[in-house]
C-alpha cells in the first residue's frame, strides 16, 4: 500500500486497552508515505498536533488557507480547537516522505484553530534541544502547545550521556529512539523503540 505506519498508542485499526495514551500524549505515529500519495482532506478538533519531518517533503493544506511543505529541520504545530480540515500529501512523485505525527490532548476545549511551521535552531551534538513548549515558555525556534508538554531532541555520540530533568514536578516523559541505540534509565532501547518514565524528577540517557 501507499502507507507504512507504526502506532505507539491505539489508533485507527490498532487497539490495545493498555496503550491508549501516556499522560497527555495520545498519538505517536511513525509514517512513511509513498511518492504522490497521502492523507486526503479530513477533520480534527480539540487536539494539539505536531508533525516532525524525518526524510523527504510533506505538503500540508488546511481550511485556514495554509499551504506549505515540511522538510527535515522543520516542524509543524497545529491546534485543531473548534475544528479544522487539512490534508497531508507527499510532495514528491519519486521519493517517499517519512515523518512522525504526534497528538497531544489539549488543556481546554474549543481553542481558536491555528497553524505554525517552525525552522528549528541547529542541533548541537550531545545537548538537549527544546523544539516544542507550552505557550509562552519556548524560544524563537520552538513551537508551542495548549498543554504543559515539552518536546526535546537529542543527538548523542556513542559513550556520551545527558540527564533529562522534568520541567514540571509530577510530569512523566516518553522517550522515542529514532536511530541507533540508547540506554534510558537503565533500559536499552533500539531503533524506533519507546519507553515512558515517571515518578522521578529526572533520568539519564546514554548512547
What are these regions (language model features)?
Residues 130-139, 144, 183-184, 188-204:
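Short, polar/charged, low-complexity connector loops/linkers at domain or secondary-structure junctions
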Amino acid at each position: 500500500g501507499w502507507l507504512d505506519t507504526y502506532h505507539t498508542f491505539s489508533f485507527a485499526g490498532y487497539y490495545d486497552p493498555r496503550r491508549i495514551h501516556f499522560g497527555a500524549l495520545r498519538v505517536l505515529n511513525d509514517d512513511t508515505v509513498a511518492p504522490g500519495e497521502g492523507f486526503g482532506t479530513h477533520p480534527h478538533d480539540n487536539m494539539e498536533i505536531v508533525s516532525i519531518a524525518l526524510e523527504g517533503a510533506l505538503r500540508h493544506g488546511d481550511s485556514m488557507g495554509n499551504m506549505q511543505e515540511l522538510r527535515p529541520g522543520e516542524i509543524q504545530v497545529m491546534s485543531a480547537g473548534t475544528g479544522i480540515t487539512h490534508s497531508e500529501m507527499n510532495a514528491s512523485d519519486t521519493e517517499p516522505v517519512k515523518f512522525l505525527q504526534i497528538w497531544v490532548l489539549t488543556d481546554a476545549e474549543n481553542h481558536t484553530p491555528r497553524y505554525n511551521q517552525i525552522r528549528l535552531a541547529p542541533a548541537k551534538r550531545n545537548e538537549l534541544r527544546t523544539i516544542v513548549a507550552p505557550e509562552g515558555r519556548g524560544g524563537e525556534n520552538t513551537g508551542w502547545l495548549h498543554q504543559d508538554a515539552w518536546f526535546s531532541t537529542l543527538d548523542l555520540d556513542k559513550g556520551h550521556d545527558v540527564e533529562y530533568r522534568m520541567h514540571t514536578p509530577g510530569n512523566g516523559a516518553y522517550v522515542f529512539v529514532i536511530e541507533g541505540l540508547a540506554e534510558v534509565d537503565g533500559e536499552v532501547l533500539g531503533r524506533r523503540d519507546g519507553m515512558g518514565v515517571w515518578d522521578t524528577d529526572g533520568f539519564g540517557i546514554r548512547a
